[in-house]
A protein has these predicted regions:
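A conserved FAD-binding loop/helix module that cradles the flavin
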Residues: 363-394
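Glycine-rich dinucleotide-binding loop and its adjacent helix/turn
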Residues: 56-77, 136-156, 180-234, 340-356
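Flanking helices and flexible, charged tails adjoining ferredoxin-like Fe-S electron-transfer domains
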Residues: 47-49, 53-83, 102, 106, ...
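Feature captures the FAD/FMN-dependent oxidoreductase FAD-binding
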Residues: 4, 78-85, 135-185, 275-288, ...
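FAD-site-proximal beta/loop scaffold in flavoenzymes
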Residues: 189-212, 297-370
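Ferredoxin-like iron-sulfur electron-transfer modules
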Residues: 13-32, 68-85, 92, 121-122, ...
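Iron-sulfur cluster-binding cysteine motifs and their immediate structural context
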Residues: 1-6, 27-56, 115, 146-148, ...
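Beta1-alpha1 glycine-rich phosphate/pyrophosphate-binding loop at the start
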Residues: 3-7, 13-19, 42, 46-50, ...
Length: 524
């Protein structure tokens, strides 16, 4: 935020990419947990961190201004020669490829689809995330040395054993949750009943360009919102969402719900599907819902209860089920020792992501279940650390590893009464563009003036935590930090005596002599 406030956008982008290789994507689709933690929210409204990041990352969309991180040259001969395979080009796989390439590897990314991005490309609507943004971010990773092989499904076109024979030393499996779930009710096997991930994939692939009639969406999460908004923009006469939860319990965010209603979708809370009705030709003509009286039990577990006598039937031309996602493994793990747990997710070490098959690491939705892009990006970063250590002889996956534990600022201890009350900047919504091209991005990027105004709202409350197990007080970090963000102060000068450089040798000489005598004669 400080670099952006000073207009040092190139440096700001470089700093962002230390932790997030896909800032232009996250600036559009992130769930903004950083803003939830922003201290400015105690004054009025949180700083629009995501919008500022989006502005900075716009530089990546132009070849003349994009930032391609320098790649480490680890050996005299050049980069590392160990071959690493990344299976899946979603956010986790792209993140892992980025950080491995930065370390000097040439990772190979296998993607079964014809385009990279995973659910970023085939799940998130284009009016939220234009696909050329994804292509621009991927191009940077390619320029860093990663290789992308599209249209290759590992397990079908090539097996893990065959890749091992080709010299691959480690594998990162990040195929995401590409399957959907049905509700297990009568009539759901009809042609006009589909699952959300398949529906979104067809829309984003251009296979659906119009959707007349009535569309009923079952589910209350952000994916269900995306389905409903797509249906509205494709011309459905009536779009309605039905979910088990009350409005306060809905998984979808308040912002997502508001945008769906603005697009023309209706939301009915407290209903669960009972039966899909078909006409004489076997086509969907309606669906019956039953009142949901309770979603979770006393221990907070998902255990819905219904009133079977309180029913509601609605007409429908199609039904889209958005009640969960599943992992489609295919033959990827055939013959491997990788173990699967709840929901068919891969079991792995929670810190290193290593599975029971030592050279196979997992991450993203195949490990956590459906989650947000930023979580997958973080997992890919950690996997890159693990894989780097794994392929280097004599290395450990855990010792000396950055635990990356988040230490929250005590916001109750911050004095906020004296700060100004400048209002939060809001990105312009271009309704004319939205009307003319419903599937183009219509929320515009901040202007430079807005960025200056918004970054000025930052309270600068960030705090750094020093690891006393590693820091020896040498001060080298203060000279190496490219952003001049580190300063070393002597809180307890009485613990040691400071001497000028010219007097260093005489002052250290007696201690060096004493130590040499102890070593030579074994004195303790």
């Amino acid at each position: 935020m400080k670099l952006a406030a000073q207009g040092r956008y190139d440096e700001a982008l470089a700093l962002i990419k230390r932790e997030n290789p896909l800032p232009a994507i996250c600036g559009r689709v992130c769930n903004r947990r950083c803003e939830d933690a922003c201290t400015r929210g105690r004054v009025d409204a949180a700083v629009a961190i995501d919008e500022v990041k989006k502005f900075i990352a716009q530089r990546d969309l132009d070849a003349a201004t994009r930032y391609v991180p320098p790649v480490v040259t680890p050996t005299r001969a050049g980069g590392f020669d160990q071959k690493i395979a990344i299976i899946g080009a979603g956010p986790a796989g792209l993140s892992c490829a980025f950080y491995l390439a930065e370390k000097g590897y040439k990772p190979v990314v296998f993607e079964k689809n014809e385009r990279p991005g995973g659910m970023l490309t085939y799940g998130i609507p284009s009016f939220k995330l234009q696909k050329d943004v994804i292509e621009a971010e991927v191009e940077i990773i390619r320029l860093m040395g990663a290789e992308f092989r599209y249209g290759v499904e590992v397990g079908r076109d090539v097996t893990l054993d065959e890749l091992r024979e080709q010299g691959f030393k480690a594998f990162y499996v990040a195929i995401g949750c590409q399957g959907g779930r049905l509700a297990g009710i009568p009539g759901e096997d009809a042609e006009d009943v589909t699952v959300a991930v398949d529906f979104l994939r067809e829309v984003n692939s251009g296979k659906i360009d119009a959707l007349p009639g009535r569309t009923i969406v079952v589910g209350g999460g952000n994916v269900a919102i995306d389905v409903a908004r797509n249906a509205c923009r494709l011309g459905s006469e009536h779009v309605e969402m039905f979910c088990l939860e009350s409005e306060a319990q809905m998984p979808a965010s308040e912002e997502e719900r508001r945008e769906a209603v603005e697009d023309g979708a209706h939301i009915s809370c407290g209903w669960g599907p009972k039966e899909v009705h078909l006409d004489e030709s076997g086509r969907v003509c309606g669906i019956t819902f039953k009142r949901c009286t309770r979603v979770f039990d006393d221990e907070g577990r998902f255990a819905p209860e219904y009133d079977e006598n309180d029913l509601r039937r609605v007409d429908a031309d199609r039904v889209v089920m958005s009640i969960g996602q599943s992992i489609v493994w295919g033959d990827l793990l055939a013959g491997s020792k990788v173990e699967l747990g709840r929901g068919q997710g891969a079991l792995a070490d929670p810190q290193t992501y290593q599975t029971a098959e030592p050279d196979i690491f997992v991450g993203g939705d195949v490990y956590t279940g459906p989650s947000f892009a930023i979580d997958a990006i973080a997992a890919g970063h950690e996997a890159a650390v693990s894989i780097h250590r794994f392929v280097q002889p004599g290395s450990t996956l855990t010792i000396g590893r950055n635990q990356r534990r988040y230490t929250a600022l005590d916001r109750d201890d911050v004095v906020i009464e004296s700060y100004d009350n400048a209002s939060r900047e809001v990105a312009h919504v271009n309704r004319d563009r939205e009307k003319a091209a419903p599937f183009s991005e219509y929320v515009e990027t901040f202007t430079e003036e807005q960025v200056r105004a918004e970054t000025a709202r930052c309270l600068g409350c960030g705090a750094s935590i020093v690891d006393p197990n590693k820091c020896i007080g040498c001060g080298l970090c203060t000279t190496k930090c490219a952003f001049d963000a580190i300063h070393l102060d002597r809180d307890r000068p009485e613990c040691s005596t400071m001497v000028k450089y010219e007097q260093k040798l005489p002052s250290l000489g007696k201690y060096a002599l004493k130590r040499a005598i102890k070593i030579k004669f074994g004195r303790k």
